[in-house]
Swiss-Prot record:
GO molecular function terms attached to this record: carbohydrate binding; metal ion binding; polypeptide N-acetylgalactosaminyltransferase activity
Tissue: Expressed during oogenesis, in the somatically derived follicle cells that surround the developing oocyte, which are involved in the maturation of the oocyte and construction of the egg shell, as well as playing a role in subsequent embryonic pattern formation. During embryonic stages 9-11, expressed in the primordium of the foregut, midgut and hindgut. Expressed in salivary glands from embryonic stage 12 onwards. During embryonic stages 12-13, expressed in the posterior midgut and hindgut. During embryonic stages 14-17, expressed in the hindgut and the posterior spiracles.
UniProt keyword annotations, A-Z: Disulfide bond, Glycoprotein, Glycosyltransferase, Golgi apparatus, Lectin, Manganese, Membrane, Metal-binding, Signal-anchor, Transferase, Transmembrane, Transmembrane helix
Side of membrane Cytoplasmic, spans: 1-20
Phylogenetic placement of the source organism: Eukaryota, Metazoa, Ecdysozoa, Arthropoda, Hexapoda
Membrane-crossing segments per the record: 21-38
InterPro entries linked to this entry: GalNAc-T, Glyco_trans_2-like, Nucleotide-diphossugar_trans, Ricin_B-like_lectins, Ricin_B_lectin
Organism annotation: Drosophila melanogaster
Identification of the protein by name: Polypeptide N-acetylgalactosaminyltransferase 5
């Protein structure tokens, strides 16, 4: 073989190898491109050529979706469900420790998650009543009509009827919330709204606010549950109206008046979304309300989330933003109350006002919960009647049985708060509320049950009914004790846990007892004959040196003055008292004076006086309860 022949062969082989390399490289890039397209597109193998391009949507539909900006999407791989909900590796409340194993998975299979798009903002109809959440002004010549219509629903129905069903609202979110990133795929939700004789405009404004301000892909359906309404327009007229809505909406009806609890259970039975979102029938959802709720649940399906509940004025329908620094608690009589978030929880959140807030209890009207978890944890207590107490029962159950309850500051929903209910209840409101509270006490309060009965004389007479099924549920879920709840979830609770004495405080000379007399904040503490029935005569002398009854503490601002009942602030000062168990006197730290029995001038009011250590300044503290904290 000549050198030239050898050279030609080598060149031919090199060209052949080069072609192979080029072909293989091209094939690799084609495969890589296909993988990328399949990874980031929902169109492949689904709607194919019908998929819309960025920025395209049906302009004739006012509620059509717009594409999320790229910087507002979070890739699915960024969701780390192995960490705690705060992104921490540890903490006092870690899921799965000490609770029943098994049950639903903590996370969702990817196949059920949907890619979503931001809902467009509702544009202001300038000059129209109530736009941008502004108050409605009723003309002077319509005041009488306004007062008459107010009686129908205990809110200004005339003002509501003047406002568009699609009224605009300001974006009330914290600036940091508007920059939040959420997962690009989230679970769908079904909205369940129970109503009874609701006004047409408030009910449909609730529905339209859901439709207008929710990512359409995440909104599975809206379920309206009519709890035996008697108004004609809530019958066929409502069914025909909702049938034309751009989101699947239908009406279920109870056969007889069932109450909120059982009506919600009926609605939940028909839910087809992954998450149930319960709303009241007189709400308005704001921009970006839904995504933060679902984004939290997608991280952990055992998290139950609530929006911040803003106020819609019952007089003017003005939209008023609520504080993001309050959480849910309860008092000695198991009444739900809003209290300021303690510094402990603020520190856990690194003082980030946009971070999820762990709340001891929820108001109960508005929240989202994974559908399977709702049933796994026992849904609602079907032994409860109508309304009242179900929010505390579910709150205790969530925390004690391994779940987490949060308020999501980046989600805002307005609610029409009324001074009184326009509805009547079979047997009366008090009977129903006490029955429900008794069921809560019997199942969840453990040894604090007797304390609750001592504080609420009506509850002692109320029948809780058969609670064996609910106790069995608690055993099956291996739930924690109420003491664990107070020590770990709600150490700021007003329920007596950390105290020296709990019971009546009796004057040695007059044999009369300190008594709140049913008075309210900033009124004087009283004194009356000792009746031994608990209630207004139960006081706790705490290890913070407070003398408290429920959320009221004895407070003295000046020497020789009266002693008032002021909301406990846990900061000492005017509310700090020292009890000498041997001498039996109660000395006020700030003034150095002692608590003395009432005088003839005012036989019902104890006073502060210089300490004389006489019998009129001696007080007997005897604990009635045996389960004091160690």
């Amino acid at each position: 073989m000549t050198f030239s022949t050898f050279t030609r062969k080598m060149r031919g082989r090199m060209r052949s190898n080069t072609c192979r390399i080029v072909l293989l490289t091209s094939l690799v890039w084609v495969i890589f491109d296909f993988v990328l397209i399949a990874r980031y597109s929902d169109c492949i193998g689904k709607d194919g050529w019908r998929c819309k391009r960025s920025g395209e949507y049906d302009v004739e539909l006012p509620n059509a979706e717009r594409l999320v900006d790229d910087n507002q999407l979070v890739d699915d791989n960024e969701i780390n469900t192995e960490k705690s909900l705060d992104g921490e590796s540890g903490g006092a409340l870690i899921m799965g420790q000490g609770f029943a194993s098994g049950g639903i998975s903590m996370t969702y299979p990817s196949v059920v998650l949907k890619k979503w798009f931001l809902a467009p903002s509702v544009q202001e109809a300038k000059g129209k009543p109530g736009e941008m959440g502004k108050p409605v002004k009723i003309p002077a010549d319509m005041k009488d009509l306004m007062k008459e219509k107010f009686k129908e629903n205990q809110f200004n129905l005339l003002a509501s009827d003047m406002i568009s069903l699609n009224r605009s609202l300001t974006d009330v979110r914290h600036e940091g919330c508007r920059r939040k990133h959420y997962a690009s795929k989230l679970p769908t939700t079904s909205i369940v709204i129970v109503f009874h004789n609701e006004a047409w405009t408030t009910l449909l404004r609730t529905v339209w606010s859901v439709i207008n301000r929710s990512p359409r892909a995440l909104l599975k359906e809206i379920i309206l549950v009519d709890d035996a309404s008697e108004r004609d327009f809530l019958g066929k007229q409502l069914e025909e109206y909702v049938a034309k809505l751009p989101v699947k909406t239908f009406v279920l009806r109870t056969e007889k008046r069932s109450g909120l609890i059982r009506a919600r259970l009926l609605g939940a039975e028909h839910v087809s979304g992954e998450v149930i979102t319960f709303l009241d029938a007189h709400c308005e959802c704001t921009e970006g309300w839904l995504e933060p709720l679902l984004a939290r649940i997608v991280q952990n399906r055992r998290t139950v989330v609530c929006p911040i509940i803003d106020v819609i004025s019952d007089e003017t329908f003005e939209y008023i933003t609520a504080s993001d620094s309050t959480w849910g608690g309860f008092n000695w009589k198991l009444n739900f109350r809003w209290y300021r978030v303690p510094s402990r929880e603020m520190a856990r959140r690194n003082n980030d006002r946009t971070a999820p807030l762990r709340t001891p209890t929820m108001a109960g009207g508005l929240f989202s919960i994974d559908k399977d978890y709702f049933y796994e944890i026992g849904s609602y207590d079907e032994g409860m009647d109508i309304w009242g107490g179900e929010n505390l029962e579910m709150s205790f159950r969530i925390w004690q049985c391994g779940g987490i309850l949060e308020i999501i500051p980046c989600s805002h929903v307005g609610h029409v708060f009324r001074d009184k209910s326009p509805y009547t209840f079979p047997g009366g409101v008090a009977k129903i509320v006490l029955h429900n509270a008794a069921r809560v006490a019997e199942v969840w309060l453990d040894e604090w049950r007797d304390f609750y009965y001592s504080m609420s004389t009506g509850a002692r007479k109320a029948s809780a009914g058969d609670v064996s099924d609910r106790k069995a549920l608690r055993d099956r879920l291996k739930c924690k004790s109420f003491r664990w709840y107070l020590e770990n979830v709600y150490p700021e609770s007003l329920m007596p846990l950390d105290y020296y004495y709990l019971g009546e405080i009796r004057n040695a000379e007059t044999e009369t007892c300190l008594d709140t007399m049913g008075r309210k904040y900033n009124e004087k503490v009283g004194i009356s004959y000792c009746h031994g029935l608990g209630g207004n005569q139960v006081f706790a002398y705490t290890k913070r040196q407070q003398i408290m009854s429920d959320d009221l503490c004895l407070d003295a601002s000046s020497s020789n003055g009266p002693v008032n009942m002021v909301r406990c602030h846990n900061m000492g000062g005017n509310q700090e008292w020292v009890y000498d168990a041997e001498e039996k006197w109660i000395r006020h730290t700030n003034t150095g004076q002692c608590l003395q029995r009432a005088t003839r001038d005012d036989a019902n009011t104890p006073l502060l006086r210089p300490c004389s250590y006489g019998k009129g300044q001696q007080w007997l503290m005897e604990s009635k309860f045996k389960w004091q904290a160690h």
